[in-house]
Curated annotation (Swiss-Prot):
SUPFAM superfamilies: Ribulose-phoshate binding barrel (SSF51366). Pathway: Amino-acid biosynthesis; L-tryptophan biosynthesis; L-tryptophan from chorismate: step 3/5. It comes from Streptococcus pneumoniae (strain ATCC 700669 / Spain 23F-1). The lineage of its organism: Bacteria, Bacillati, Bacillota, Bacilli, Lactobacillales. NCBIfam families: PRK01222.1-7. This is N-(5'-phosphoribosyl)anthranilate isomerase. Belongs to the TrpF family.
Length: 199
């Protein structure tokens, strides 16, 4: 069954909703954005997450030192990196890694040392999707996540199109920039039970 990552969580209530609804991954954004949390805030929220739900830290062009500090302080299970990725960034990390790839039309999939790939729109976190026809996942070495403009109305179609390891949502479960608990529940239900949206 396709796994679900709910990203950009910053409140106790949103974390508890995502966990109780069946999220497999909870994402904390450490890069500058409206969803950014500090390591200290994430460490407190992480206490609400059971061991079978994985904690993911989201970074943009981080140093290895930044990753190691966050892994240690928050107890991250995975790191997700956007932007520049140094050749040795993922080597011998104490947790798993995800490399984000912005799908911009050239069809290029990098040769990555990460454990997973995540395919996203050109502007991550914008709520915009990418042209699914521009991405060929045939023969990928790693399991992959699909992100970029997913919501309760299109996520089942995305799963049918790509058969991904997991789907990732942030703005698609928000209302006016804040996580909407009912949208979180409905999104996860659509993924887990294959209920198509109305649009």
């Amino acid at each position: 069954m396709t796994k679900v990552k709910i990203c950009g969580l910053s409140t106790k209530e949103a974390v508890e909703t995502a966990v109780s609804a069946g999220a497999d991954y909870i994402g904390f954004v450490f890069a500058p954005s409206k969803r950014q949390v500090t390591l200290e805030e994430a460490a407190e929220l992480a206490k609400l997450i059971p061991a079978d739900v994985k904690k993911v830290g989201v970074f943009v062009s981080p140093s290895r030192v930044e990753l190691l500090e966050a892994i240690d302080k928050v107890g991250l299970d995975l790191v997700q990196v956007h932007g520049q990725v140094a050749a040795d960034l993922f080597e011998n990390l104490p947790c798993a890694s995800i490399q984000a790839v912005q799908v911009d039309g050239n069809g290029h999939v990098p040769n990555s040392q990460a454990d997973y790939l995540l395919f996203d729109a050109p502007v991550a976190g914008s709520g915009q999707s990418f042209d699914w026809g521009q991405l060929d996942t045939t023969g990928l070495a790693q399991p992959f996540f699909i992100a970029g403009g997913l919501n309760e109305d299109n996520v089942v179609k995305a799963i049918q199109h790509f058969t991904p390891y997991a789907v990732d949502v942030s703005s698609g479960v928000e209302t006016d920039g804040q996580k909407n608990h009912e949208k979180i529940r409905r999104f996860i239900e659509r993924v887990k039970h294959g209920i198509s949206g109305t649009k």
